[in-house]
Amino acid sequence: MELKNIEQQPQLQNGNGTATENNEKGEQKPTEGGERTNWGNGLEFLMSCISVSVGLGNVWRFPFTAYENGGGAFLIPYIIVLFLIGKPMYYLEMIIGQFTSQGSVKIWSICPSFLGVGYGQAFATVCIISYYSSLLALTLYYLFVSFQSVLPWSYCRDEWTNCVNSRPEDYSSTMLEAARNATSSLLIGNETTSLADNDSVQLQSSSELYFLNVVIKEKLDISDGVGAPDWKLTLALLVSWIVTFLVIMRGVKSSGKAAYFLAIFPYVVLFVLLGRAVTLEGAVDGIIFFLQPQWGELLNPTVWKEAVVQCFFSLAVSCGPIIMFASYNRFDHSIYRDAMIVTTLDTLTSLLGGITIFAILGNLAHNLQVDNIREVVRSGTGLAFISYPDAISKFQAVPQLFSVLFFFMLFVLGIGSIVALQSTIVTIICDQFKSWKYWKVALVTSICGFLLGLVYVTPGGQWILTLVDFYGGTYVVFILAIFELAGIVWIYGLQNFCDDIEFMCNKRVSLYWRVCWSFFTPVMMIIIFIYSMATIEPLKYSDLYFPLAGDIAGWIVFAIGTAQFPLWGIWYISHHRNGNLWQSFVSCLKPNENWGPANPETKQAWLLFKSEKARQRASKTQSSKMGQFWQKVGNFCGSST
């Protein structure tokens, strides 16, 4: 595919221009013109990628997803999906960001009519940011109350019927008391219904009732609205956004330094919790329960779909952070090594988090004298703010300390993720308006993020969170990831893309990457997306269906996100007419003059490199039909021959 309106210049000797000029300590400098700052060093980039990819999804989402989809058997489809979809997408986004030194919208100079993919991903990122900050608020709330002499969720309030104290020393007595209260509540006239014979009566732990009644003040019906924001959670939300702003206000200069702590500290706490968890009674049963494979689930297409969703959620691909982080690299940074480290570490952390969490849940089941651990397992926010606190309150030694460590770890994990997501939006805006100050854009977007987050700290906030995550996050991200891959690999061309990688990394692209990008990754994603849409069911929260208005609102959110792709494509074609409509359409599928390395001298060398590659291929083209056939196969697979 040819480049339009770009004059070819003589090649530089090193092929990388001033991008390779570094000081003796390996510090990375901005490109000429000061248009883009670089990371202080390569380790800051690696730590930043770890902090966003190793996040809340590893600690509470992966364990439950694995448990629900075959236990240990889930690891097989997850690892297969990781190698065929996760790693290829992650590496592709790192490459495209570093090669162009642009954010997730500006990179689409590679295929201008696909500009809407970048804006659609930005919309999905805003949706994720809006509810992610509310999870930070909940985490911060629990962190603050953990400093009390008695953990507030460990005991029942007088007004809570059918409540069981979470404190182990109170369990036996409160269990009997709760049973008596439940039985007495079933008295109807002179008739008494036995508790044992009534399945509708369910005992609840004090940690569950504390979360539902005290923290979020849950509404089970939002037909009359979601209610007003809770002032305590609003304050926690404000603190979360202040911390986020302070981390990102100076761009990679500040976030790069914070990344060391954001990436390393959670591992320290996770290993401390693991050491404590495996020594608890019942921990082994919990770990076995987590890892024990259910082989029959491997034939369930839903398991493979969940593996893909978990992979995307965990690695943060197709949302913009990976492209954004890589865009601040030197042009010749060793990106392959970092991609392999992060994707491998992400998987190992998920396993570590799963073992730790289910060891704690095994102890919880042991203390509650429950044979089936399924009865103490919850998903999503329930797992983080009900099951974990309930288990921690049963620790015999200083439960407050472990509670503080655990929720501070969750807060740090969340900050690492939201810093990356928020920086993505700020970078997109600053790339569009280069005269705008980075810190001012960061401040305004942080204020907007806080205002958007207020809806999630209302009594009906968990309903909205479920809705936005499902329609505005998961499905929008997934479908745009397919278009992202198609635009780069199928429209721009895998051969062109592999040439760009060879120029930047100074080595050929392996067959594994070429086959994944050209065939396995897009085909698997398309099949899984079609299956997901064909089997989609009405959305529920806490086993309750959303009202019709909620479903309509969700589909509107989905439509807004996905409509960015065709709408921006139409806009670009209409503003860049080149002949008739068909000629304009074809022209807008080709890279424009902005595509290529950001450094002018590097770009000159790249253009000559591409011309030489084209000349070599032309000279090797065979005249026979068989030769032409294999030449087409090579082009499709990105072969440089």
UniProtKB/Swiss-Prot annotation:
Sugar-bearing residues?
181, 190, 198
Q: Which UniProt keywords apply?
A: Amino-acid transport, Glycoprotein, Ion transport, Membrane, Sodium, Sodium transport, Symport, Transmembrane, Transmembrane helix, Transport
- Spell out which residues lie on the membrane's Cytoplasmic side: 1-38
GO terms assigned for molecular function: amino acid:sodium symporter activity; D-amino acid transmembrane transporter activity; L-amino acid transmembrane transporter activity; neutral L-amino acid transmembrane transporter activity
UniProt-listed InterPro entries: Na/ntran_symport, SNS_sf
Query: What is its membrane topology?
Result: Multi-pass membrane protein
In Swiss-Prot or TrEMBL terms, this protein is called Sodium-dependent nutrient amino acid transporter 1
- Pfam families tied to this protein: SNF
Point out the gene that encodes the protein: NAAT1
Its annotated function is as follows: Unusual broad substrate spectrum amino acid:sodium cotransporter that promotes absorption of the D isomers of essential amino acids. Neutral amino acids are the preferred substrates, especially methionine and phenylalanine.
Name the residue ranges with Basic and acidic residues bias: 22-35
| Upper lineage | Eukaryota, Metazoa, Ecdysozoa, Arthropoda, Hexapoda
Read off the PROSITE patterns from this record. NA_NEUROTRAN_SYMP_1, NA_NEUROTRAN_SYMP_2, NA_NEUROTRAN_SYMP_3
